C-alpha cells in the first residue's frame, strides 16, 4: 500500500483489534502541548478511542483504495474471509476454516460462517463473487485490479469464482500461488453491499460514490456514523457484526488532519489517544525518553521516484535518461537522511525489494549480494562517478572550487510531496545533495488527496514514494510497475505516446506475467531477481531506506497489538 506513516500491522491492530481494546482512565497529565512527557493518559470517555491517522482519505471503497489511511478505515467497516491475529498469523474471519486446496493447488474451496450486513441481511458467498468481479472489472478502474489476475477467467471474462451454495466459495486459479491466502485477507478482497453500490451509481460512472458519506451498509466491527469531511469521522460499534460480543469499544473517533504539529498538540492535551506521526523535530526528544513513543519493524521501502515521461528527459536517449537518474541516485546521502530525518534506526536501502522479505520459496529474497549501489557512501563520496554519468548524458561541468560544480545546461526540477514535516525534510536533504553537481530542485508540498492524484497522473518530475508490503512476497513490490498497474506512478510503459527517452517496458510486463504463472518456484525466484534488475537499471526508482514505523499511544490504553 502507498505509505503514509502508519504500519500495515498497526492498521490491523487499530482497526481490527481495537475491538478488544480496553482502557483504565485516569486524570490527564498536565502538558503545554509541546514538551515530551514520560507518559500520558487519555481524557476521552471510557467507551471511546480517539485517533489520528491522516487527513481526508481519498476513498474508503475496498476496491478503489490503495493507501494505508483508507485501508485502516476500511478494516473498521468491513470483514473479509481471513484476517491476522496479534502474532501476524493468518486466521479465518468470515471463513469457517482455512481453505481446502486441490492437489494441483489451483482450486480453493472456502466454507463461510453465517454473518450479517449492518442492515441485518445475510452475507453470502455471492457477495464475494460480486465484489471480486467488481474490483477486477476495468470499468471500476481499481489501482489493485491486478491482484485478481491470479484467478482464472470464465469464457465471458468474469472471474472463476463460484458460489456453490450460500456459504461456499469455489475459486480456480491460473496456477499455484503461494500467497493467495494472504490476498483473501487483503482489503481489496473484502465484500461490499451490492445494492448500495448500484443505487448510488446506476450508470457505473462514479464507482466509489456509494461510500462518500456516512451511513452505508457494511459488515465490519464498526459502521461509519458521521463524516465531517476534512475534519472528523465517527465509527460506532456494529451490533450485527459476527463477533460483536468481543467488541468492547463503542466508538472510534478519527481526527482528519495532516498537520503533525496540531495532532501532536492534541495528543499531548489528551484529546487524542493515538497518533501515527509527530513533528520531525520532536523525534529525538521522544525516542527512548517517552514511554508513549513506539518504534516497530515494517516490511517496505521508502523511495524517491522519477516520472520517466517528464520533459526533463526530452532529447535524451533511453540510456542517457537512465544515466541522469542514476547519477542523482549516487548523490543521495542516505546515512544523513536516516540519522537526521528518520532518526529511528531505519536501514539505508540498496535495493527496492526490502531486506527480510521472503522469496516465496522458503528463503529470503535479498542477500548480501543483492545490492545495486553502496548505500553507505555519502553523496560527496560519489560526486565524480555521478558527474561521469551526467557527462555521458551530454552535460558539462565547471569546478566551483569548493567541492561543487556548475552544470551546463542547467538542470532544474521540482520535488513533489504531501504535507508532512518528514517528507519535506527528506526533500531538503536531496536539495543539498543534488546541488553538489549544480542541480536545482524546488520542493512542492500538496494536500494528501491532491498529491496522490498528481503523482498517479504523472504530474511531476520527481516525487517522494513509499510502499508497504501487502503480503510477504517480492511480486507485491515488483508488480507495482507493470504498465497496467494503477500504482505505477513512475509511468513506466504508460502514456499514449511515451517519451522517446522512456524505456520500452514490454519485456518487464512479460516477465511479471511469467512470474505470476510459473509453477516452478525456484525459477520464480530467479525471474523476480531479473525483474528487480530491470527496474533498477532504469534509475526511475531510488530507494532511500527500509521502513520501520513510529506511533504514540496513551499509556492507559490496553489491548492494542
Regions found by a protein language model. Name each.
Residues 96-142, 170, 266, 318-320, ...:
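Aromatic- and charge-enriched surface segment that lines or borders ligand/interaction sites
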Residues 52-101, 217:
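N-terminal lobe/hinge region of extracytoplasmic solute-binding protein
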Amino acid at each position: 500500500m502507498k505509505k503514509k506513516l502508519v504500519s500495515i500491522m498497526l492498521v490491523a491492530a487499530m482497526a481490527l483489534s481495537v475491538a478488544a481494546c480496553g482502557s483504565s482512565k485516569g486524570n490527564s497529565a498536565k502538558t503545554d502541548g509541546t514538551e515530551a512527557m514520560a507518559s500520558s493518559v487519555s481524557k476521552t470517555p471510557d467507551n471511546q478511542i480517539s485517533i489520528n491517522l491522516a487527513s481526508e482519505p481519498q476513498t474508503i471503497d475496498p476496491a478503489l483504495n490503495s493507501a494505508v489511511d483508507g485501508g485502516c478505515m476500511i478494516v473498521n467497516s468491513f470483514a473479509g474471509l481471513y484476517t491476522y491475529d496479534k502474532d501476524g498469523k493468518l486466521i479465518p474471519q468470515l471463513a469457517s476454516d482455512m481453505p481446502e486446496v486441490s492437489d494441483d493447488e489451483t482450486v480453493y474451496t472456502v466454507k463461510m460462517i453465517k454473518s450479517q450486513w449492518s442492515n441485518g441481511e445475510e452475507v453470502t458467498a455471492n457477495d464475494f463473487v460480486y465484489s471480486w468481479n467488481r474490483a477486477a472489472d476495468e470499468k471500476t478502474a481499481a489501482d489493485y485490479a491486478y491482484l485478481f489476475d491470479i484467478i482464472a477467467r470464465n469464457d465471458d471474462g468474469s472471474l472463476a469464482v463460484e458460489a456453490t451454495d450460500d456459504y461456499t466459495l469455489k475459486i480456480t486459479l491460473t496456477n499455484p500461488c503461494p500467497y493467495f491466502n494472504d490476498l483473501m485477507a487483503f482489503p481489496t478482497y473484502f465484500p461490499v453491499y451490492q445494492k448500495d453500490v448500484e443505487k448510488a451509481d446506476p450508470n457505473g460512472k462514479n464507482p466509489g460514490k456509494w461510500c462518500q458519506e456516512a451511513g452505508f451498509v457494511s459488515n465490519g466491527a464498526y459502521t461509519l456514523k458521521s463524516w465531517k469531511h476534512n475534519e472528523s469521522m465517527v465509527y460506532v460499534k456494529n451490533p450485527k457484526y459476527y463477533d460483536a460480543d468481543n467488541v468492547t469499544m463503542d466508538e472510534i473517533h478519527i481526527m482528519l488532519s495532516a498537520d503533525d504539529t496540531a495532532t501532536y498538540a492534541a495528543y499531548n492535551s489528551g484529546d487524542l489517544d493515538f497518533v501515527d506521526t509527530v513533528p520531525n523535530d520532536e523525534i529525538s526528544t521522544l525516542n527512548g525518553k517517552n514511554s508513549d513513543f513506539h518504534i516497530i519493524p515494517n516490511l517496505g521501502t521508502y523511495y524517491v521516484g522519477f516520472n520517466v515521461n517528464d520533459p526533463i528527459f526530452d532529447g535524451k536517449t533511453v540510456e542517457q535518461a537512465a544515466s541522469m537518474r542514476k547519477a542523482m541516485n549516487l548523490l543521495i546521502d542516505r546515512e544523513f537522511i536516516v540519522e537526521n530525518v528518520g532518526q529511528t534506526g531505519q536501514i539505508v536501502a540498496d535495493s527496492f525489494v526490502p531486506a527480510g522479505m521472503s522469496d516465496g520459496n522458503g528463503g529470503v529474497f535479498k542477500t548480501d549480494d543483492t545490492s545495486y549501489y553502496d548505500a553507505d557512501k555519502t553523496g560527496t563520496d560519489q560526486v565524480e562517478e555521478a558527474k561521469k554519468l551526467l557527462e555521458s548524458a551530454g552535460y558539462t561541468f565547471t569546478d566551483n572550487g569548493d567541492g561543487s560544480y556548475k552544470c551546463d545546461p542547467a538542470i532544474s526540477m521540482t520535488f513533489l510531496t504531501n504535507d508532512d514535516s518528514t517528507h519535506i525534510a527528506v526533500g531538503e536533504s536531496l536539495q543539498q545533495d543534488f546541488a553538489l553537481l549544480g542541480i536545482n530542485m524546488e520542493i512542492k508540498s500538496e494536500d494528501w488527496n491532491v498529491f496522490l492524484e498528481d503523482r498517479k497522473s504523472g504530474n511531476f518530475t520527481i516525487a517522494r514514494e513509499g510502499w508497504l508490503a501487502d503480503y510477504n512476497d517480492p511480486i507485491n513490490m515488483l508488480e507495482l510497475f507493470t504498465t497496467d498497474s494503477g500504482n505505477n506512478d513512475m509511468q513506466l510503459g504508460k502514456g499514449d505516446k511515451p517519451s522517446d527517452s522512456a524505456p520500452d517496458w514490454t519485456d518487464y510486463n512479460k516477465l511479471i506475467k511469467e512470474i505470476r504463472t510459473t509453477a516452478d518456484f525456484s525459477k520464480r525466484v530467479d525471474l523476480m531477481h531479473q525483474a528487480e534488475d530491470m527496474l533498477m537499471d532504469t534509475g526511475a526508482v531510488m530507494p532511500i531506506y527500509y521502513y520501520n514505523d513510529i506511533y504514540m499511544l496513551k499509556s492507559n490504553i490496553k489491548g492494542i497489538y
